[in-house]
Amino acid sequence: MAAGKFASYHRNVQMNHPLVSSMDLLGSKSALGERRSDAFKNVCIHGTLPRKKKERVPIRSSDMFCHMGTLPHTKSHRLPNPLMQDIKEDYPFQERRTGIFNMREHYLDPAMEYVKFSKDRYIMDGGTPDKLKKELEEELKLNSEDLRSHAWYHGRIPRQVSESLVKRDGDFLIRDSLSSPGNLVLTCQWKNLSQHFKINKVVIRLNEAYCRIQYQLEHESFDSIPALVRFYVGNRKAVSQQSGAIIFQPINRTVPLRCIEEKYGTSPVRRLELGIMEVKSEPTKRLSLNFGQGISQEQSLVRGNLLRNKEKSGSQPACLDNMREKRRPLKAHQSESYLPLGSRQPCLSQGMDMKTSPKPHVFRTGSEPTLSPTEIRRFNHEVHPVEALRGSDSQLCPRPPPKPTKAPSIKQSQSPLVWQSSEANYCEFHPTPPEDCAWSDSHSSHNSYIEDQRTDEIETLSFSNSELSFPALDDSISQCSATDFCGNVEDDEFIRPVYETVSSFCPNDFQSVLLTAENKPLETSLLRRAKELFTNNDPRTIAKHILRMDCKVARILDVTPEVERMMGVSSGLELIILPYGHQLRLDLMERHSTMAIGIAVDILGCTGNLEERVATLHKIIQLAVEVKTLGDYFAFSAIMKALDMPQITRLEQTWTMLRHQYTQTAITYEKQLKPFSKYLHEGEALDAQEDVTVPLVMPLVTLLERQSVLFEGMDFWENNDRGCEILFNHLQTARQVAHNATVYKKNAQRILEGFKPDELMSEIFKTEFQMRLLWGSKGALLKQSERYHKFGQILTALSRKLEPPS
């Protein structure tokens, strides 16, 4: 409008008053630009500064410099031309008056070459390249544990920008996550694809007053991000097993982090806007009519907050982020385009009549068409009625929701994405349930997205370690039964795992071929019969019998579907790391200690000549070799525990004769078995898990059941200089044990395939039989601590009887 009215004026004519408004400049099309487009093809719309050329050019018409506004100046400001709406004034009017105009009174020197000068670039660069270089060097000189000291850290850059930086396989950089503030993302290129890996933060609370943060991608954890990068780059290890991506070439930043933050925005609102952009678009720049404010004012606008809470005007809807309610943080999987603002509205069903909800006291201004009435909008009801929000054309954040499609074939019901917010999903649980514990009809709809989400939530309610709490939901659970709560689940009905409180070992109810109804501790006939069975079978057969019984006790093999439902998992190796696996952990400790005591009794019970005792020791060492070969580290640790008891190690005559008569066995024990046992108990056998059938779980079980009294020697990390490292290794082993439970089961099935166990041999390796043999029918019912203490005294007496102390 304005451009058409004054199209006949020469563009350098000065006026005393502005003739157009900022809205006219931004909203209307200039007729002058249409008519004289050919005349301005070579015109640069940026500000210019003179620079001396080597060669002189012939003087041309003053039209060549018409874009500079070189007519004699007056006291009034010049009129901004519509063609110059993207111009950012580099210098105030007075500076140009005293500077540029003094060179020539009426025209510029044609010997000068005018260089493009960008205002944005000037602000981003902070002045000169030398200044930027110095600032970057200062950042890189910081502590090596500081992320800013590493050039591969790029700060808050958008996802699309990071993908454009990594161009070859192995290229990588670290950036801040815009969708999940506070987290870091590893961006890399692998197999010609840009991949992003979120770096997880793990808070390790050592005690109530001290905790530390570790960073991990999959399994390995590190105290800092630089340590994580050094590990994956130095070892050329895949950052993800699924993708196989390997990083080795860092992409370094060339400017300070300050410039990156200024370019892509430092405020949370600006980061949100960058996060939801699918295609990069240059935002419309706002032309300021006040040229006298200069760079200082423009610079403060860039570095300051671009949002002004009041007196905004424009054609877009007002920003809702100025309301009092705090914005909720986004989850990593949620879309920023559908961020819920303000209070939640109850979910609507298809069967209900659409009722008009009371409108909030928020006034919408601008010419943007209103959204479809079928789309549910949530605003804050706590805003003051008198506070009207007015938009700004160029500086509103975040962007308004997308306009509804005009295609009649696409219905709103087919786009449930507006409800993918976690707050929207959980709004189903907040209304108070009726007395009959059934969900209200107004909160459910047939074949609805919300109902599917509610079903998914119900399936994951129990045994959740989340720190979030839903009071209304907790009240509902306490009032309703599990059957009513899961009434809508047809296929996979959730069954609450059973917290076992009774041991699976029942010595007095044990049906035995060798034992009578009541027996005394260490009956001679039973000891003799058990020793015959042990002597008449080869170590390989004995090892398979032990492996079979260990797999049954640990619930690796022969687990019925009923037991699986009771446990809530498919293997006992998973159950032992869960809170309600307390009883299984106690049973495993019982079997381990009972087996070790039984082996010690087998050696110390040889009250005859020395040769018999040495032969028994030789057979037990061979058995340790076999169970190690079969991968039964549980039994292996029990045997090694027995051989390492002080009552056994003090038998100097027995060990000396073993070295003479069975030299190879003694060497195997000293050079192979003992180092491997130490290796296992220090948690260093993480890589030796391929052929394992029953992993070593005793250190983990001991740690989780510290309140229980165990046989001495299991809490070895308490008096070790590397105690913390050993403890951490066992916690890492626990992860692998639970993760590889299926592998252990397959290994055990493969080894025991076609094996036909002997009934009597199987009986003597059952825990109930060993308890009755060692403590009798009455003593087996005593407390564990009391039984172990008394039997320790018995073993000491037997050892001193065989070889009296000197």
UniProtKB/Swiss-Prot annotation:
Residues 308-343, 390-412 are annotated as: Disordered. InterPro entries: Ras_GEF_dom_sf, RASGEF_cat_dom, RASGEF_cat_dom_sf, SH2, SH2-Ras-GEF_adapter, SH2_dom_sf, SH2_SHEP1/BCAR3/NSP1. It comes from the Eukaryota. Residues 538-805 form the Ras-GEF domain. Keywords: Guanine-nucleotide releasing factor, SH2 domain. Residues 152-251 form the SH2 domain. CDD domains: SH2_BCAR3. Transmembrane segments: none annotated. May act as an adapter protein. This is Breast cancer anti-estrogen resistance protein 3 homolog. It comes from Xenopus laevis (African clawed frog).
